Curated annotation (Swiss-Prot):
The gene is MT-CO2. It is found in: Mitochondrion inner membrane. The lineage of its organism: Eukaryota, Metazoa, Chordata, Craniata, Vertebrata. Residues 1-14, 88-227 are mitochondrial intermembrane. GO terms for cellular component: mitochondrial inner membrane; respiratory chain complex IV. This is Cytochrome c oxidase subunit 2. Pfam families: COX2, COX2_TM. Its EC number is 7.1.1.9. The keyword Transmembrane helix applies. PROSITE patterns: COX2, COX2_CUA, COX2_TM. It is an enzyme of class 7 (translocase). It comes from the Eukaryota.
Length: 227
C-alpha cells in the first residue's frame, strides 16, 4: 500500500502490475535519454559558436529527425500493446465476482455461490480499532483466493465510479448500464487497498476497497461460513 511521501509506485503484487512497472521503467529510460540529448544540444548552442544559424536546407538532418522519433514511438508502443492484450485476456477464471458501485459504497456478489453477497461500507474514523487505516478500512472485506485467475464484473447502480486497486495493476470504470470485466491474480497473500477513482459526488473520497487474498483452503472455509 502507499505510505506518506512515497515517490515510486506501490509494490507489485500481480503479474500485470509487474509488467506495468517494467513498462514504466522502460518508458522512463527513453524519456530520460531524450531529455538528456535535448539538454546537451541546447547547452552546445549556448556555449559554442560552431552553429549554422543561417542553414536553409538540410535533408540529412530532416531525415534523421523524422525516422528517429518514429523508431522511438515503436519501441514504446510494442510493449504497451502487449500489456493491453494481457489485461484484456481472461482464460478459465477460477471465480467470478460481480461488484456494483453505489453512492457511496460497493456491493459484491460471488456468482459461483448461492446467496453469497454483501455491501462494503467505509468504517467511520470514530469506530476504527488501533492499527486500522483511516478512510481505507471497510466493514466487509472482499476475500479472494491467491494465485488463481479471478474475473471481476464491474458496473454501477447510479453514477460513474471506478474500481481501482493500484498494487494489483487494476482500474476499471463502473458505468451504469454497462458491464465491464477485469482479471485479478495475486502472487502473495495479504491486504490490498484501493479506492473509487472517478469523482462520483460529495462522498467520493469515502468509497474504499479492501481485498484480502488468502490461500485456497482459507477461502473455502470463509465462503462456507458466509453461506
Amino acid at each position: 500500500m502507499a505510505y506518506p511521501f512515497q515517490l515510486g509506485l506501490q509494490d507489485a503484487s500481480s503479474p500485470i502490475m509487474e509488467e506495468l512497472m517494467n513498462f514504466h521503467d522502460h518508458t522512463l529510460m527513453i524519456v530520460f535519454l531524450i531529455s538528456s540529448l535535448v539538454l546537451y544540444i541546447i547547452t552546445l548552442m549556448l556555449t559554442t559558436k560552431l552553429t549554422h544559424t543561417s542553414t536553409m536546407d538540410a535533408q540529412e538532418v530532416e531525415t534523421i529527425w523524422t525516422i528517429l522519433p518514429a523508431v522511438i514511438l515503436i519501441l514504446i508502443a510494442l510493449p504497451s500493446l502487449r500489456i493491453l492484450y494481457m489485461m484484456d485476456e481472461i482464460n478459465n477464471p477460477a471465480l467470478t465476482v460481480k461488484t456494483m458501485g453505489h453512492q457511496w459504497y460497493w456491493s459484491y456478489e460471488y456468482t459461483d455461490y448461492e446467496d453469497l453477497c454483501f455491501d462494503s461500507y467505509m468504517i467511520p474514523t470514530n469506530d476504527l480499532k488501533p492499527g486500522e487505516l483511516r478512510l481505507l478500512e471497510v466493514d466487509n472485506r472482499v476475500v479472494l483466493p491467491m494465485e488463481l485467475p479471478i474475473r471481476m464484473l464491474i458496473s454501477s447502480e447510479d453514477v460513474l465510479h471506478s474500481w481501482a486497486v493500484p498494487s494489483l495493476g487494476l482500474k476499471t470504470d463502473a458505468i451504469p448500464g454497462r458491464l465491464n470485466q477485469a482479471t485479478i491474480s495475486s502472487n502473495r497473500p495479504g491486504l490490498f487497498y484501493g479506492q473509487c477513482s472517478e469523482i462520483c459526488g460529495s462522498n467520493h473520497s469515502f468509497m474504499p476497497i479492501v481485498l484480502e487474498m488468502v490461500p485456497l483452503k482459507n477461502f473455502e472455509d470463509w465462503s462456507l461460513s458466509m453461506i
